[in-house]
Design a protein with these regions (language model features):
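Conserved N-terminal catalytic core of the sugar/cofactor nucleotidyltransferase
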Residues: 1-12, 20-27, 38-117, 123-127, ...
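Left-handed beta-helix
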Residues: 2-7, 208-363
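A residue-level structural signature of the nucleotidyltransferase/glycosyltransferase Rossmann-like core
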Residues: 113, 195, 202-203, 274, ...
Length: 363
């Protein structure tokens, strides 16, 4: 199977607000549209580039919120408007995947689809392409869902975990269980056991199997669409979604489908992966500088500083002394200085407090 296979498609999920990476990621300009590392390509563009090696470029669809559609058009000018799905309200991934898969199915009912977040790093793209193509071949031949798992290198409470069940082939296992963001002590138990892999949130399926599972497990999504509009057109679909999407449940594809389906498998992968959604995960993924500090495209002078991550705007200089294990991040009208450990919970708390006490202009 090659990337010219006419049945292979991709859905890039790019509608999130990225609040775990606040204040660098803001409501008005979330992280997927940022060139966060100063490499010349945004996270969305890098995801598109990566997936265009696996499926034909004109088989890539982008889900995003309507307020971010112009960012997608500017950053991916080769993607046609019919391949950009504009969601009228923020919802979790289950409604997004259902809508994009429906649009793809109307073009090709034999489609095999990769659904991917837009905020991940892959360090071995050749291995990534190999694993993804093997995965697409697997879901083409089997009515199932396939999650891509990566062997954990540390106890990471900010990640999801997949417990391996029975082996069904080389590197392929039935999923025993999913656990989302465990406490650190449980994450250590998972890693030490050798039975758990990180959940990359990359999952593959054939569209017929997805349809069957939505009909059985989450029938409220897309119910009645095919009966109301038996003759497909993008215009009628967009109008229907603008009216009905807000009524869909705010639930992830993991909770709605994958954790409840009986036909979910995991592939052991080794393509070098990191979730770029949190400060701590970015710190762990990045190459460390002097005293294990990570400085991201920023101008900094440090003395007696260890294990920190720093991200500043262009034209700003930070002089830091005596910090150990901190995040120092500034964007526009917000400066964040907080401990790096378990920062996901801290950042979530601060975002909520700031929004309530200071207003949306700081979010």
């Amino acid at each position: 199977m090659t990337n010219n296979d006419h049945n292979n498609y991709c859905i890039i999920l790019a509608g999130g607000k990225g609040r775990r990476l606040w204040p660098s990621s803001r409501n008005a300009y979330p992280k997927q549209f940022l060139d966060f590392f100063g490499v010349g390509r945004t996270q969305l563009q890098q995801t598109y580039d990566r997936m265009a090696r696996i499926v034909p470029a004109d088989h890539i669809y982008i889900n995003t919120n309507e307020e971010y559609v112009e960012f997608v058009r500017q950053q991916l000018p080769d993607v046609s408007s019919e391949h950009i799905l504009s969601e009228p309200i923020h919802r979790n991934t289950a409604p997004s995947v259902a809508w994009a898969a429906h649009r793809i199915a109307m073009q090709n009912p034999e489609a095999c689809i990769v659904a991917t977040p837009s905020d991940q790093a892959v360090f071995n793209e050749e291995a990534f392409c190999k694993d993804m193509l093997e995965g697409l071949h697997f879901v083409a031949d089997n009515s199932c869902f396939l999650s891509m798992g990566v062997k954990p290198t540390r106890p990471e409470p900010g990640y999801g975990y997949i417990q391996l069940g029975d082996s069904v082939g080389e590197g392929l296992y039935k999923v025993q269980s999913f656990t989302e963001k465990p406490e650190r002590d449980f994450a250590k138990i998972f890693v030490d056991s050798g039975e758990f892999y990180w959940n990359t949130s990359l999952f593959l399926f054939n569209v017929k199997h997805l349809y069957n599972n939505f009909a059985h497990l989450l029938p409220s999504v897309l119910r009645g669409y095919d009966e109301k509009y038996p003759v497909f057109s993008v215009e009628t679909e967009n109008a229907y979604m603008k009216e009905n999407f807000p009524s869909y449940p705010n639930i992830s594809i993991d909770y709605a489908i994958l954790e409840k389906s009986n036909d979910v498998y995991v592939m052991k992968c080794d393509f070098g992966w990191a979730d770029l959604g949190t400060w701590h995960s970015i710190y762990e993924a990045m190459k460390k500088g002097e005293n294990d500090n990570v400085v991201i495209d920023s101008d900094v002078l440090m003395e007696d500083c260890h294990n920190n991550i720093v991200k500043l705007p262009k034209g700003k200089l930070a002089v830091l002394n005596g910090l150990d294990g901190f995040i120092v991040a500034e964007k526009d009208n917000v400066l964040l200085v907080c401990r790096k450990e378990d920062s996901s919970a801290l950042v979530r708390k601060y975002v909520n407090e700031v929004q309530i006490k200071k207003g949306d202009e700081f979010i």
